[in-house]
Design a protein with these regions (language model features):
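Conserved short histidine dyad/triad with adjacent acidic residue
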Residues: 28-44
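Short acidic-glycine-tyrosine-enriched beta hairpin
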Residues: 63-78
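Short, conserved beta-strand element in jelly-roll/cupin
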Residues: 32, 44-58
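Ligand-binding loop in jelly-roll beta-barrel domains
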Residues: 78-99
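A short, N-terminal "cap"/entry segment at the start of jelly-roll beta-barrel domains
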Residues: 1-25, 60
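A cytosolic small-molecule/anion-sensing beta-strand core signal
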Residues: 53-54, 69-70, 88
């Protein structure tokens, strides 16, 4: 068992992106963004799960916009091009799982 802290950094910094765990073919990344911050379009050679702990993030996946919050979960297949924009101050987990 391993309990991993994911502290809130946005009181101290403008943006925070950190890989917090890597095992087998899985990476777990904590992203914390201020309102309006973006991540440019890219793709990942893995299944991607987005789990929002705080805030609201707009993902554009293959041209389609979806709002991700604490009330839902986003799955993207390997190779799906996507970008994102924080609609609110946001703290979320990104799980990249290679097939």
């Amino acid at each position: 068992m391993e309990l991993i802290d994911t502290p809130y950094y946005l009181n101290e910094t403008h943006k925070h992106i950190e890989k917090v765990l890597s095992f087998n073919d899985t990476n777990v990344v904590n992203m914390q963004l201020q309102i309006g911050q973006t991540v440019a379009e890219h793709e990942v050679d893995a299944d991607v799960l987005i789990i929002v702990k705080r805030g609201k993030v707009i993902f554009t996946v293959e041209g389609r916009e979806v709002e991700v919050s604490q009330h839902n979960l986003l799955h993207m297949a390997p190779g799906e091009r996507h970008s994102l924009r924080a609609e609110e101050v946001s703290d979320f987990m990104v799980l990249q799982i290679k097939r």
